[in-house]
């Protein structure tokens, strides 16, 4: 459970700043478009003068946007399909929770723990520093903390 102060800080300050800074960077190169997922999936395609700004701020926006999308005021159940995929990848839901918690608590400093779908279609737990996104590694994030 999260407290209101933490959520307000992350939504109204951090996320809003990432959006503003990503937009400011994109304005310098309108020719590259505005699809952050496509751009961050191929960071070398981003002009050098705005690359790090988009990695940091575009990643921050995408990471937070997924996080907000996943939040719910009520408890939700894992679908049978997802539960089966988790059991196959990690052995059990309890093992998944342990590994995911370890990824989250093992990150020194700021960053994210992720459940991702790899290019091969399997589930994987990973962690990224700061506002780096697994999209840049060719992975599709489906759970973020």
From Swiss-Prot:
Coiled coil: none
Keyword Oxidoreductase set for record: yes
Binding-site residues, Fe(3+): 10, 64
This protein's UniProt keywords: Iron, Manganese, Metal-binding, Oxidoreductase
Signal peptide: none
Keyword Metal-binding attributed: yes
Cofactor(s) required, per the database record: Mn(2+); Fe(3+)
Enzyme Commission no: 1.15.1.1
Binding site for Mn(2+): 10, 64
GO molecular function: metal ion binding; superoxide dismutase activity
Protein name from the UniProt record: Superoxide dismutase [Mn/Fe]
Function, as annotated: Destroys superoxide anion radicals which are normally produced within the cells and which are toxic to biological systems. Catalyzes the dismutation of superoxide anion radicals into O2 and H2O2 by successive reduction and oxidation of the transition metal ion at the active site.
Leading EC class: oxidoreductase
Reaction(s) this enzyme catalyzes, per UniProt: 2 superoxide + 2 H(+) = H2O2 + O2
Gene: sodA
Cofactor note: Binds 1 Mn(2+) or Fe(3+) ion per subunit.
Cellular component annotations (GO), alphabetically ordered: cytoplasm
UniProt record similarity statement: Belongs to the iron/manganese superoxide dismutase family.
